[in-house]
Amino acid sequence: MQIKARQFAREHSLFSCIQCGKCTGGCPVNLKTELNIRELMYHVLVAGKKFEVDDIEVLWDCTTCNTCTDRCPKEVNPMEVVIGLRSAVVEGGRAVPGTAKVALQSVFNQGNPLTFSSEDRAQWVGDLEVRLLSDEPGAEYLYYVGCTPCYDPRIQPISRALVRMFGQAGVDYGILGTEEGCCGSEVRRLGEEGLFEMLVEDNMEIWEERGVKKLVTTSPHCYNVFIKDYPQNGFEALHYTQLVAQLLEEGRLTFTGELAKTVTYHDPCYLGKHNQIFDAPRSILQRIPGLKFVEMDRSREKSLCCEGGGGRMWLEGTNIEERLAHQRIDEALGVGAEILATACPFCVLTLEDAVKIRGLEDKIQVADIMELLTQVT
């Protein structure tokens, strides 16, 4: 599959690239694979009229963490270059590799990448009393749960904790239940632009029907795609940490216990590097009675990617022996943390998997912030 190199370079501002190497120098995946985004952009620039994209296996190693874009002094977006090249591969009729193909097919057929039935999307609710917007539209907030929080047994407790907290704080909210569709974040980042556009159209249509003006998400990936890649037709999106921090500030949530643990925080890339939401999660943790908060050296803008973004939850990549999540666990242990907290379903899964693989369950626990809050409220 060939792309029109000059047109692609213009569309992605590649003629501004000065080949300084800051993108590759900061790329966490470059430490373990042959992905070199500076070199990749150079080859597009010097390709002449056509550039061959079929055989670039490392193209699928990128986690879209945004470090390269943050570091670029010329305001080029190398991450979008990767997504654009992936899109060219898909549009050219080539399938994405590995289990990502299954995930994309599942999104098309069932509205989620996890191969579960769309009819089971609201089973996470269990016996909780939750308002369905199909029955009672017009709530102040749509709680957009997301695919992984709806279906994954490890993540479902986070969704349930949020619902209980909404009730305690008197938040006027509702869910879409089986009407909720995939946000499309990873679909777009795997290069399936056509499917992504279909999801956007379907989601915005149901939001309009249900009177959605504000929505709050479990996942930073959903939050990011809603504010960056969806048409901004009068709706406001929040990540749950923003809303919870606000509720605590307003005194609408009260603590009934304490958590006498040493806790550090892992910044999810799509909350931190992509959207500069660093303070809200920390303010929540630092309010918990008894909790001792410690910071890792690689935090905030310098946070190490867990390797779950950009569709990598469904792609092993070219080097499965070395995992960034294992490094992150070492960093958390290095500052004496008993709990590694985060605020992203993908981060919870990758980091907890690293703990289990290394047999460190008796040394450190991985938890979402909501799982800690539910212990003390």
Model-derived features with residue positions:
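Short, charged low-complexity linear segments at domain edges
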Residues: 1-9, 34-51, 279-288, 312-316, ...
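Iron-sulfur-cluster electron-transfer modules
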Residues: 5, 11-14, 31, 41-180, ...
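Residues immediately within or flanking Cys/His clusters that coordinate Zn2+
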Residues: 14-24, 59-69, 180, 266, ...
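A broadly conserved sequence feature marking short terminus-proximal activation segments
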Residues: 17-41, 273-276
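Phosphate-coordination loops involved in phosphoryl transfer and adenosine-cofactor binding
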Residues: 138, 259-261, 337
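Cofactor-cradling patches in redox/metallo enzymes
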Residues: 149-239, 270-287, 292-377
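Catalytic cores of enzyme domains
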Residues: 238-243, 249, 253-275, 287
